[in-house]
């Protein structure tokens, strides 16, 4: 078999091997309900490091907590309530997102109160210092009172108040924008007659791991944070393995930031993040309490001294919602989704989206995909347009590769002559081949490049489709209602024409009876092979024959958006290669190669025909 076919088999085999490794090391996660993420109980905050602190103690999961009044939250994107017990933000749902494709299904619930499975909420408060004790400051079980009445909404803040009975009056004003950002202004009025010291804190806590934890290797779920430009990601298992810190009374990691940062919990599509005032030093803490199985993220700001008769105020923010790219980017660059006076940008906030190892590819790929979707209005068409752009971007390199492939075809008669002269002397054959390649300026490995280039692009697009919420429940046409999910159709029921249901996703039957899109993928790969005749070697010919159908089943249960990309990529590659080969005097006999693939005993081909890749026999030179 000629070297070009060997290179093609090598490149295809390498692609297959990479996908096999990916498939087995990173198997698709089990289907889960995307409704209610897990939630955590809170614990009392730890005093700032400037003073000796008592260890924090979490509220046990089965603790009996008194019924309290609540303040309703109602915005265009959010609904829920704030508990007067601790002033906890512990009841929050996302109006724009449903658990399933059914518009009548429940909306996604993000936060849940203590007493419900996997409690998950945010809490703010003060840590005492100096002469103050924990009974003098508001904490997890403080009962607050609403000043005035009404629900929390856009441009409708609510104010909570608590008097400690010893001259200190604490006030908390909470506001929310039209997306997912809460602003929390905490004030303390000192009427005690003596100066007091205390430090503000924020807590996001979860009871146990999320019920819908996907535990997928390429997906980060757990604590995510940034401190002075450094991003940290800690999965739940790693949080539970943190070293015991006596001062914290728990397993913990403490990071002191000098200028900016944030910390919280991230799921695949949702996030709850504490954002202290930027430009000021603060401490971020990741903590795990084994006895109560509580995961906790904290921010602690600097110690505040309040003179008698004075009032101190500290402001911070809380993001609780969907990781929408445009929204996150607006908070990062402008501090708000709309021009807002005094809004502080949040450095590095876009990295709360899990861009993965290939972030240098996933970020620009998604940026272009998002823009195309905005322009076209259909994510499937945007993926097709993105494929054309990517192919145009690598066309110069692909062109050189295809030209090299065409030149290799021209060398086949000379290579055959070399083989006859060299006989069984492999060293002589290798030396003469290298001399011929150098003389003709041909790179035999260049044919691998078009396939190898696709590998990082394929995995980057896979990452984008898997983690970005913009692809979640994004429809294409017809039966493809969710491009982030596998093709739901099945050959088992003739793609919905038969009166019986398709196999349940994830079952062996579903693995065998794939959908229409994977079949189109196999056909497109098979058609691409027909630009060249089958290899003469029977074993290599069999590998070529089976490769498209193996890929068809391998990729059949990947996201349909990714399979769509691969199909379009194959068709563009087929067209490019065909045009370039014809421009260099080679006319692929596609129909002849297809016919030969169905023949049990392919007819013997003239030497010139074999050498010219299914084209008309070359004219013999006159002696």
UniProtKB/Swiss-Prot annotation:
GO terms for cellular component: plasma membrane. Residues 601-623 are annotated as: Disordered. It is a multi-pass membrane protein. Its main location: membrane. GO terms for molecular function: membrane insertase activity. Residues 601-617 have a biased composition (Low complexity). One of its GO terms (biological process) is protein transport. The chain crosses the membrane at residues 8-28, 379-399, 449-469, 507-527, 543-563. Required for the insertion and/or proper folding and/or complex formation of integral membrane proteins into the membrane. Involved in integration of membrane proteins that insert both dependently and independently of the Sec translocase complex, as well as at least some lipoproteins. Aids folding of multispanning membrane proteins. HAMAP family: YidC_type1 (MF_01810). Interacts with the Sec translocase complex via SecD. Specifically interacts with transmembrane segments of nascent integral membrane proteins during membrane integration. This is Membrane protein insertase YidC. It comes from Cereibacter sphaeroides (strain ATCC 17023 / DSM 158 / JCM 6121 / CCUG 31486 / LMG 2827 / NBRC 12203 / NCIMB 8253 / ATH 2.4.1.).
